[in-house]
């Protein structure tokens, strides 16, 4: 929302809370809510398309909330890629910083997520190729900006009727230099180095998640449905084998080293015996993604060039992102200053320019 020409707002009650939005957003209808906000679908009368409007809940309630709000806005503003959710609009009914308390974010309305799709149908190998290719294409972009998503799972991957995919929910994403902050990812898709707090993790935590998702698309079953951290790790090691001593010795955590050294030795299984009937190229790619040693795990850019994606791979159409300045992560500011910086970011937002066919997808 730039302050050039402030739109007319109207008020509407949604699930016992008052929403105050520009008149261009009509037919507000609740579609979901979580800890950090609630979402309505709406008709954008300016463009004629359906959008998702998210009202952040108590965005400046505490320093943690205020910094999270700033982070989410900065991340969404930065993302301009077909396979990553981007910001169409951001607004507040407030007319000045003094009365600024509400933040609304507008993005594309995506119909289904990958969870719905897996439940409804067994996917063909060609479907799996196209879906995983798009996830990796989006990840190459995200990772090139030195951002780790850290919460990749089927419900964070939106898919439309044409099988076109966007990566959602950067609320938890952090800069690669950041250490673990506890609350990340649904455990089933979580890389073991995060789960066990091995600490030295990198962008390939997202590749582990893609491997788990790809295996699920191929088989129709969750790959590692662990009941808790220990059970999860046992399930992982039944497939990957126990880590070699060369990897254990590089773990900074004494507890992790001691615990893993105490486990009974398990050999790595032959993936072809686990994924019977799958395309051998798919199996080969899974073996390169589901590697315990993060230094040996394939990157998004490398995976895009894997023969499994031969019919989709185009090195000239797999863009990287502009560098993303995340020096703010180490800043300790008060609520009012985070709020002021969020307000500045909102005022300076320039909406993306879309072709009609892009909006229709």
UniProtKB/Swiss-Prot annotation:
A Gene Ontology molecular function term of the record: MAP kinase activity
The subcellular location is: Cytoplasm; Nucleus
Report any Pfam family annotated for this entry.
Answer: Pkinase
Q: What cofactor does this chain's UniProt record say it requires?
A: Mg(2+)
- Coarsely, its chief localization is cytoplasm
Q: Which family does it belong to?
A: Belongs to the protein kinase superfamily. CMGC Ser/Thr protein kinase family. MAP kinase subfamily.
The protein, known as: Mitogen-activated protein kinase 14A
Organism of origin = Danio rerio
User: Taxonomy-wise, where does this protein's organism fall, top ranks first?
Assistant: Eukaryota, Metazoa, Chordata, Craniata, Vertebrata
């Amino acid at each position: 929302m730039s302050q050039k020409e402030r739109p007319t707002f109207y008020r509407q009650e949604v699930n016992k809370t008052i929403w105050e939005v520009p008149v261009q957003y009509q037919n507000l209808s609740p579609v979901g809510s979580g800890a950090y906000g609630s979402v309505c679908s709406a008709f954008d009368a300016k463009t004629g398309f359906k959008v998702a409007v998210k009202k952040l809940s108590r965005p400046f309630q505490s320093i943690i909330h205020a910094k999270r709000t700033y982070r989410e806005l900065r991340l969404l503003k930065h993302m301009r890629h077909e396979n990553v959710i981007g910001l169409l609009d951001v607004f507040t009914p407030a007319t000045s910083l003094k009365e600024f308390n509400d933040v609304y974010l507008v993005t594309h309305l995506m119909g289904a997520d990958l969870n719905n799709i897996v439940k409804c149908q067994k996917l063909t190998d060609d479907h799996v190729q196209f879906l995983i290719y798009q996830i990796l294409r989006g990840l190459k972009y995200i990772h090139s900006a030195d951002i780790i998503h850290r919460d990749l799972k089927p419900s964070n991957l939106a898919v439309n009727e044409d099988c076109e995919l966007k990566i959602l929910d950067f609320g938890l994403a952090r800069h690669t230099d950041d250490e673990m902050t506890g609350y990340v990812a649904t455990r089933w898709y979580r890389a073991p180095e995060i789960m066990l707090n091995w600490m030295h993790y990198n962008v390939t935590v997202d590749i582990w998640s893609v491997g788990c998702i790809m295996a699920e698309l191929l088989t129709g079953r969750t790959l590692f449905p662990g009941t808790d951290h220990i059970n999860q790790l046992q399930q992982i090691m039944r497939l990957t084998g126990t880590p070699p001593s060369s990897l254990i010795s590089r773990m900074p955590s004494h507890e992790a080293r001691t615990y893993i050294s105490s486990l009974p030795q398990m050999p790595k299984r032959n993936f072809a015996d686990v994924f019977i009937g799958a395309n051998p190229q798919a199996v080969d790619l899974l073996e390169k993604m589901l590697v315990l040693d993060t230094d040996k795990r394939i990157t998004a850019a490398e995976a895009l060039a894997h023969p499994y994606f031969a019919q989709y791979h185009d090195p000239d159409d797999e863009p990287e992102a502009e560098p993303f300045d995340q020096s703010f992560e180490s800043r300790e500011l008060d609520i009012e200053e985070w709020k002021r910086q969020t307000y500045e970011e909102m005022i300076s937002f320039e909406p993306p320019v879309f072709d009609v066919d892009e909006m229709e997808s």
